[in-house]
């Protein structure tokens, strides 16, 4: 008979039996039986520790004696009265101390190894006879167990029980047998469920036969208000019932049908056509690929080859590059990432946003795409390439003692005002208009560039409700007087003042106000335009600097004396210039008003853009003008030539004055 008891992961079997031959019996010795041996072992360990400590002290004493003897001998060898200091002495003592510590650690490690070996017992077959005799009572041989049974007087009175300890891994929780799940039921109402008293639905071979299908059963989950809407599977809807109110107007009627309809029917037809058009639009949009904004979908800069550097500014540097696939030449602007830990530069975000919002306009530079490099700090913007900037063109003409003609001035100003008018209608301020930010192509098209300071503005009449914009904008020479006097807010007149300065530069071939500081710039403006008063500029008292500084009074009239006295512009042109350089921003001309000015309609007319002066661009490495422009000039020169002679000149692409007569003639 056997009894099993479970204790954690061990199972102990206790059996009652009288058969001693099949069972191995042993007695469990009391816990204090090997106490004497443990005490003896501890005493020996203490003695060994004491000996080790004594040996260590003797070794240290010997080292100290050697050190003192060496020191004494060194002092004897040194001259009398001289005190020397050996730099190597502290190092040698430190090394001796480290050697002693290393020897102590090695001795302790050897002692630990001996103790660990004493704990791990080897099998009886590998032990010596002496070690077998000195083994603990827990490892007594079978003969010892037999003697214990003989010498024990109470052995016969004890129960003949045998304890067998087996390592059996058993789960503390009783596991259930696996059962196949045949059916299950949802507790929540997630759909129509067959009632428990309803028989299972049979398979019907002919699915198309409506008579072989059973009627739709009612379920407890069907609400009362939906029972009337359930249609049996056996029923079929008629064509008239199947058509909804919109399906009746799903087809566009003919002209005769349309005329015969009433107004209500025509209205329903219009609504149906509108719904169909919106549905087609939604379907077309749904078929488009999903657009994921951000830099992750941008092309790599390796798609372009950088040809040369064009310029470097405050917020980035510009390169001339070529697309390796299309061979298109573009301008690549690399944004500066000086504080990349703070995120993408706000100036770069504004420039990209404003250029995209401005859209496609002939007089605004067009953005093609955003490119990324190998690192997060390499972000480029690909724009259309324009050969010149207006400032370099003016410098080139001034070095050759040339000026813009009146017709050329009108062409440049009309293009500039057209681009600014488009921006202001979209509520965009450029805030950095100057000749170096105006580009001009070989074909004479002017384009506004560098939107790094551009920003949207509001239309609120109340000055407190407008956006608070920073006054530190616009290059100093083109900055309006209200910006120099620190206003609370500003709007489109700041751009119009810059355009007035640019127009004066087109006429004079140099900047008009060249101040070296803000106070000096204000002084030059007031010397040219006169010191303003509260009568001509009522809102000037709200400017911060005006209330802090007292400006000397200057009478206006210097602007007229310069431009009219030197006959740089006629009266109509001066009126336009004076309207854009008005001190009071409320009375300053807008872009639309300037475009409608009489100066553009009077003689001389604006010349075509192709007739503007063009020079080889530095950004093109002194490349020649395009071929088609040379052909247009050649055609103009050949207009007065004879047809045969013109055809010959056109064939060889030469001018008439380049031909030299010769004495060769054909005899008839």
Curated annotation (Swiss-Prot):
One of its GO terms (cellular component) is cytoplasm. It is an enzyme of class 2 (transferase). It comes from the Eukaryota. ATP binds at residues 310-318, 333. It is found in: Nucleus; Cytoplasm. One of its GO terms (molecular function) is protein serine kinase activity. This is Cyclin-dependent kinase 11.2.
